[in-house]
Amino acid sequence: MVMPGVMQGTDMKVADTPNEGLQEYRTADAYEAWLKKERVKVYEDFYFPSLAKIELGPWERKGGKGAVVHIANRHMPDDCHVVEIKPGGKSEPEHHMYEVTFYVVSGRGATTIWHDEKHKQTFEWNTGSLFCIPLNAWYQNFNGSGAEPARYIAVTNAPPMMRLFKDDEFMFNCDFKFRSRYAGEEDYFSGNGKLFTRRVWESNFIPNAPDMALYGWKERGAGGINAMLEMADNNMKNHISEFPIGTYKKAHRHGPGAHLVLLSGTGGFSLVWTKADRSDMSKCDWQIGSMVIVPNDDCFHQHFNTGTNRARYLALRAGDMGLNSPHGGGGANADVSIKEGGWQIEYEDEDREIHQIFEKDLKAHGAPCRMKAFVPWCTGEVGPTSGRDT
């Protein structure tokens, strides 16, 4: 006969579990609590045809109106704040224990940054400017126009950071100064930078992201060019890629949260899917100012230029959060075939339907297909080869 409270065949004692009266354990979501406290408009989606047309609600401390965008993913690595500073307006000074990258959608203005009230720095920005605020530095944004609003997006790693510390007092009132990241250097926001191997460009301020110099990245396909951005010594990672008329990039996959913002192009789209049979595939048509967010883990996505000029996009993502080796740039497998253990589908391995969708969209835009050098069943012309040949 088995003794009560002892697991049969072992010497482990098993505590009796009450049949009733127990409650399910739940922990408060610090990020969701912050959103409610801010009373800010929230969008949960992964595709926005126009950042300029997103309807905003009041967000006075940011200088006017705003909204928070995030994907429907409980492992959300980042979010996106869409903010419009009213004409002549300014934000309230703030600092915080999460990283943030700004991209100016429209307008002009300035940002003042400081650790010490007596030693403030101010730099100016315009439409197309890209910059990062050093971790926990004080800053304030100003609209430089008295007649027009200034709109920007700010991609942050606030969701995981807030959920890690679960304390707003620490997140927004910690007085520690990360001087290894920013110590008041006069040239910090000068726009100067340094080029490293693997197309890595280190700079804290990019005055005009739609026209900055990019470098060849033939592994991602069809004459594409790219720069991997390292900014403000952040864990957050950004990059800019461009590809020629009548071409498309190879599909690849990675985790959720990469925000892709179209900087140039007159037509094109992204395909996004997770299932092997692509039964969940979405086609996201884009224009300048469209944003597509990678919504899921192991989510394939592929970008197509069906317009009549170059297509360039900016990708803003949370990065590795300190979990991987400290290499600059993108993931080591981003341009490696899945046949070799990477994340990328080579042109010869993609389903023919992908190219058919591309050629159909090209015809609608009156643009030629220029993928013959890469896709044998292409009905168009040779176009670029492996280099930057438009």
Identify the role of each PLM range:
Residues 2-76, 167-239, 349-390:
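A short, N-terminal "cap"/entry segment at the start of jelly-roll beta-barrel domains
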Residues 90, 95-127, 137, 253, ...:
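A short beta-strand-loop-beta hairpin characteristic of the jelly-roll/cupin
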Residues 85-87, 105, 123-145, 155-158, ...:
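Conserved metal-binding segment of the jelly-roll/cupin
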Residues 140, 150-178, 302-361:
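A contiguous, mid-protein "functional segment" used to position or interact
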Residues 226-227, 237-240, 246-248, 258-260, ...:
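Eukaryotic modular interaction domains in large regulatory/scaffold proteins
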Residues 69-75, 88-100, 130-131, 137-138, ...:
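Short, low-complexity cationic-aromatic patches
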Residues 269-300, 308-309, 331-348:
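Glycine-enriched catalytic-core subsegment of oxygenase/oxidase enzymes
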Residues 61-68, 79-96, 239-255, 275-276, ...:
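Conserved short histidine dyad/triad with adjacent acidic residue
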